[in-house]
């Protein structure tokens, strides 16, 4: 999910294009016949449908196309690595990498989250192999030394030079714009510089990978991330967040003070405490300081600033973005017990995102055939598929929690808009106007949102098929056979949502039959939608049969 200078000649130097600010009137224009290369499909009321037919299978098909492309469809570069291990972006025809700073921590964290949802959905174990490949590479080539004299030991770098085998932050002077009156540094963070919020994001990815695979190296990597974050948490204010946005890994010298992306870090600390890993008192202390700041500042003043690694350095937190706000809203919707005011906070975030990033810009309309299309950040206001899909997924979760029908409609139309960014090859572009291709925007931070949407609104999953859509745990094994679904979860207590092609007559957990019930251990089945909900206690293995 990079920001500036995406769309021009990926194989050559990329030139930044300043996006318009929200609130500017879009020029009148005729309805175009196509969106991102696909003919526009509308319903009888002129509202946007997906380009995929049949419509009811659109989101599952987009996921299949894009995952298949990622798993099988990219070349090996001159450095011996597949494109997605060394480049942020790629050419639309050759699929070879482009000359812009790589953002591995963001990409790999998103891929782990997406794979942990797509594996139970599909049963395709290749995505687990991909998780191992990207994480093993970054552990070996993108991690600070385990040297206690370093301020940030044993944690991931967020960025790298394009084509580099080793990630150490990018040499930012290589990516300064040649036509700037003075060089604007900071793109790719700078050599030796890391981003603490990505320590939290990829730390959470490592923890999820441990749950998926049982590999203790990933648990230990997550522990190192949590310890570094707890050690460096600080009081925040309107100009300084609990962790800086950019910091020199060896010395701890701060390069940029403010970053509001706390959702993944809060969840990492929550999970470390829940699982009894490491120092619970330290996790609680760090979490409390971060949470208090989040409530006092971004949740109150809407300064959701800084996330993207390829933006130049700014002296103050003026580059607002929807990513940090949207992921904070997701955290609250998935864990409402953490915040008594979750309804007010999430409603505020969703309204702010729609007003600030769903409005018209100089180049693009904010509402297209009834779909709210979301821009990325103040410094780059192009409408993008991944960010529109994030908005859709959070709206779907809000609908699930509140039964708000307008949120469901917004989610549906925005998801439909986002499908247009994926072509029949499974190549996903950033957006219809900003048409470059990124592994973050097209895969890591795109696919996971469709999975979240189908989990929140199960009737959006393909009918007449069998799919495990969501679990409160991590699903470590799944097996589909005609008239049967079997799965195993990491936690011995949890809830799952499935869409089935058959009416279940037998649901067992740990070999013990569950009873149909709306509350407590058991299951409920909606025959009109084919939706099964399982609630289990003291059991990891579930089998469903007709």
Predicted segments with their positions:
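Bacterial N-terminal signal peptides
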Residues: 8-19
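Carbohydrate-binding/catalytic loop surfaces
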Residues: 79-102, 149-193, 239-264, 302-329, ...
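Solenoidal tandem-repeat scaffolds enriched in leucines and small polar residues
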Residues: 189, 193-196, 200, 205-210, ...
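Surface-exposed beta-strand/loop patches in extracellular or lumenal glycoproteins
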Residues: 488-505
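Non-membrane alpha-helical segments in proteins
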Residues: 100, 106-121, 133, 203-208
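Low-complexity, Ser/Thr/Pro/Gly-enriched N-terminal "stalk/linker" regions
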Residues: 27-106, 125-185, 223, 228, ...
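Terminal, non-catalytic domain-edge segments
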Residues: 27-80, 133, 178-183, 187, ...
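C-terminal beta-strand-rich structural cap/linker in extracellular carbohydrate-active enzymes
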Residues: 496, 521-546
